Amino acid sequence: MNKTALKTRFAPSPSGLLHLGNIRTALFNALLARRSRGLFLLRIEDTDQERSSEEYVTALMEDLRWLALEWQEGPEVEGEAGPYRQSQRRSVYQADFQRLEAEKLAYPCFCSQEELERVRKRQLAAGQAPRYPGTCARLSPEEVEGKLAAGFKSALRFRVPSLTTIEFEDLVRGPQRFATGDIGDFIIRRTDGSPAFFFSNALDDALMGVTHVLRGEDHLTNTPRQILLLRALGLPIPRYGHIAMIVGRDGAPLSKRHGSRSVRELREAGYLPEALCNYLARLGHHYEDSGFLDLDTLAAQFDLARLGRAPARFDPQQLHHWQREALARCDLDTLERWLAPVAASQVPADKYQDFIETVRPNVVLPEDALHWAKVLFSEELVLKDGILPIIHEAGAQFFTQALAAVDGSGTDFKALAAQLKQTTGAKGRSLFLPLRAAFTGELDGPELARLLPLMGVARVRQRLQNCVDQSY
């Protein structure tokens, strides 16, 4: 591939399951690469070995593949810029640590966390933004050697140039400007020898040829630090774009109390990947086409200029909308396989296909199909709130007449309703609502004309008899 071709990346830390914010970032980067016929790269940022887990590496790759977000470089695919796991790149980082230190662009820092916390509190009390005061930057070479010889552990800090302004054009937020005086020297290598995020993240982007980085707005203030590092190392600087965070309806950062779940949880609940992609692609990005789009079309219409700066509000109902749209495009075989794990054991085999076709308009998730299977085929019917008063209002005589009508109509609902209308004089809501209440225990649902043949005459009669008994 042409070295100047656009390349994006997704660089998760495998310390947990992917959530909606993670996967939307991955989706936007994948769409941008696909639209431009570029490359989408996956890098595993597992330098924190205590928090990283192989289980989560496997899980995040499964989630990406489930969503059809295939990477062209990365684990299990590889490429010219590998390895693509940061835990396997220690020698790469070490070489540049040594180079920066040799060129006096970085220095050992022996400050303890307690010392740094005391300084931070003093700065905050004085109304100053916390920043490193440069304590160890003033140590002489002899003092550094003495501390190292005495067994003091050191981190490595990047020496931020003074009186400098960092400017860049954010792909989403436009011109950005940061004064280095507000930054302070920052750690690039921890005391245990592992690279800090600022360092390994920026270095790998450059070495792996990443040209465009779309990431959360919480990384905006990291960008000037990373630009300084890449300049110091003489490496190319990607173009950065910082996308708006996802919030709940109350404007607070998205959490489980807003209905947010991990991608794995959504997958296990039965959401379809096409539904999730259609929803997330529009969460902070405006598409002129409001219809259901496949991944190629989502990519073709993806436009950086249409990425919003305001927080994107998560709405579970919108996710349900796209789930319905995705389901409407599924053929019957796909639906049968999708619902089989929860519904097949609850439905007689000879009625399974008719059941799927009947409840399809009322199903968003497999749990909905399970609910209707229990409604239709369980011996005991659970009545929803508000159903019993409807049964009482219709009265025993109504359901007695309905039982008589079944003798002539069987499970033909239209014939049953016509005869019952004639014998009781009930019509409209007064006719149909008590029957729905009797047969399903619900106020709404699939067409009764399709439900009764599934239930069979014996169950239809039993439920009408139950209503007769409950009406006295």
Swiss-Prot record:
Compartments annotated for it: namely:
Cytoplasm
Provide the E.C. number(s) assigned to this enzyme: 6.1.1.17
Q: Which family does it belong to?
A: Belongs to the class-I aminoacyl-tRNA synthetase family. Glutamate--tRNA ligase type 1 subfamily.
| Pfam family of the protein (one) | tRNA-synt_1c
- Give the top-level enzyme category: ligase
Please identify the protein, giving its name as recorded. Glutamate--tRNA ligase 2
Q: Which UniProt keywords apply?
A: Aminoacyl-tRNA synthetase, ATP-binding, Cytoplasm, Ligase, Nucleotide-binding, Protein biosynthesis
Name of the coding gene: gltX2
Transmembrane segments annotated in the record for this chain: none
Q: How does it assemble?
A: Monomer.
Q: What does this protein do?
A: Catalyzes the attachment of glutamate to tRNA(Glu) in a two-step reaction: glutamate is first activated by ATP to form Glu-AMP and then transferred to the acceptor end of tRNA(Glu).
**What GO molecular functions are on record for this protein?**
ATP binding; glutamate-tRNA ligase activity; tRNA binding; zinc ion binding
BP terms from Gene Ontology: glutamyl-tRNA aminoacylation
Enumerate the residues binding ATP: 256
Highest taxon, organism lineage: Bacteria
- Identify the residue span(s) of motif 'KMSKS' region: 253-257
Catalytic reaction(s) noted? tRNA(Glu) + L-glutamate + ATP = L-glutamyl-tRNA(Glu) + AMP + diphosphate
- The record places the motif ('HIGH' region) at 12-22
InterPro entries, alphabetized: aa-tRNA-synth_I_cd-bd, aa-tRNA-synth_I_codon-bd_sub2, aa-tRNA-synth_I_CS, aa_tRNA-synth_I_cd-bd_sf, Glu-tRNA-ligase_bac/mito, Glu/Gln-tRNA-synth, Glu/Gln-tRNA-synth_Ib_cat-dom, GluQ/Sye
Tell me which GO cellular component terms the UniProt record holds.
cytosol
Recorded source organism is Nitrosococcus oceani (strain ATCC 19707 / BCRC 17464 / JCM 30415 / NCIMB 11848 / C-107)
